[in-house]
Regions:
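Glycine-biased low-complexity/repetitive sequence motifs
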Residues: 1-50, 57-424
């Protein structure tokens, strides 16, 4: 046989450690889902879409099945092998996929412990499970050997398997919704900015590899039960913006694995409708301008957790007249205190920046009081004297800035839950 020649076997393959032989079904190329029979081999064409091959039910020792990538398309549309209740290579948690171009596999059923074992194959790692963790839920992405699940709304994180090389833990980021800033019909005594949503995070290198966590990361990862199961995920909405005289709204809490991040506090108002003090929360809302000087912003890290999930809102101007309101608190910095004058609103406090998804993203910054800037990381929004304030960005948990002159404040930003672990 010349060097480099390719042999196309369209007959019968024998032995391979099995008691039977593979009779290749050359007259019936499989382009859709099918159930395999003992002793048969199949050419599978996935060029038009993924295909699932279901292995025979109630197999006996020595049963044999073959499969070959007919169109060299498994790398585009993978073949899924449905275990049909039996292990593959001793694993019985997942139905494995074959995504290697040109793959050719002979599977022999050995016993109830190991199940089907590939004896002649291009993918010797094929097995019905993983040595690490397997799970589903949210939007799934990969970063090297690590998988990331991002939940931008309520959902379920389902652990299918915890393998023998897994430490049974995941890293997490739980961000609550941000609070709304105040709104006032007048042109003096700026309302306070909304507080950023509570921010909680863990990092354990043996769990999820090397990445840059926020300063708030808890070094002890939240353990996940070694038994497969489901974990409800709650993602909090941002507090709704208000019209002049409206009572500001806190953000809503986010939670996962029994851990909760509190919603950001609403900013304070002071106007002809009466005074509304800033509210506590994951991070506190900024103090209202006007009234007594030196009013404090809403408390952060409420209820208290360690490390703290947020910081207090900024106070109002310490002197009259025309006192500026305070900026909303952020995850890593208190809101800035207001200063005297019509443009004296404090800026929002800085949020927290984390690379848990593979790229750095800032979340849970505070909103600015009128004419006060947004949080320096951009997750909160600035105050506005002459128009409505902007809504804080979705899934970043920032507080919204406050408004004056009859304008409305924007919504706080919704939260997010992110989970990261090793999967291969």
């Amino acid at each position: 046989i010349p060097s480099g020649a390719t042999i196309n076997n369209q007959g019968t393959a024998t032995n391979f450690g099995a008691s039977g032989a593979v009779n290749w079904q050359t007259g019936s190329i499989k382009t859709g889902d099918f159930t395999a029979a003992n002793g048969e081999g199949y050419f599978v064409d996935t060029s038009s879409g993924a295909v699932t091959m279901t292995l025979p039910s109630s197999p006996s020792a020595g049963d044999i099945v073959g499969v070959k990538d007919y169109a060299l398309s498994f790398d585009t549309n993978a073949l899924t092998i449905n275990r049909n209740g039996e292990p593959i290579n001793g694993f019985n948690a997942l139905n494995p996929t074959v995504g290697d171009e040109g793959a050719s596999i002979i599977l022999v059923y050995v016993d109830g412990t190991k199940g089907w074992i590939p004896t002649v194959d291009d993918t010797s790692s094929l097995k019905g499970g993983t040595d690490y963790m397997a799970a589903t839920g949210g939007t799934e992405t990969e970063c090297g050997n690590f998988k990331i699940h991002s939940f931008t709304g309520p959902g379920t994180f389902t652990v299918q398997q915890v393998g023998p090389l897994s430490n049974g833990k995941v890293d997490y980021q739980i961000v609550a919704g941000g609070g709304s800033g105040g709104a006032r019909p007048g042109t003096s005594d700026n309302p306070g900015g909304g507080g950023g949503g509570g921010f909680r995070e863990s990092k354990c290198a043996t769990t999820s590899g090397t990445w840059t966590a926020s300063p708030l990361a808890n070094p002890t990862s939240q353990p996940v039960s070694a038994s497969p199961g489901t974990y409800p995920i709650v993602v909090g909405a941002g507090g709704a913006g208000v019209s002049p005289c409206g009572t500001t709204n806190p953000g809503n809490a986010s939670s996962a694995f029994g851990l909760t991040s509190a919603g950001g506090g609403g900013g304070g108002n002071y106007d002809s409708c009466g005074s509304v003090r800033s509210k506590s929360g994951g991070s506190g809302g900024g103090a209202r301008g006007g009234g007594s000087t030196g009013n404090a912003g809403g408390a952060g890290n409420t209820p208290p957790v360690s490390p703290p999930q947020g910081q207090p809102g900024g106070g109002n101007s310490p002197s009259s007249p025309d006192q500026g309101g305070g900026g909303g608190g952020g995850a890593t910095e208190a809101g800035v205190t207001g200063s005297p004058g019509p443009n004296g609103g404090g800026r929002g406090g800085a949020g927290a920046t984390s690379g848990i998804t593979g790229s750095p993203v800032s979340r849970s910054g505070g909103g600015g009081s009128v004419c006060g800037a947004a949080s320096p990381d951009g997750s909160g929004t600035a105050g506005n004297r002459t128009g409505n304030t902007s809504n804080a960005a979705d899934n970043r948990g920032g507080g919204s800035g406050s408004a004056m002159s009859g304008n409305n404040s924007g919504n706080g930003g919704s939260g997010i839950v992110i989970i990261r672990y090793r999967f291969q």
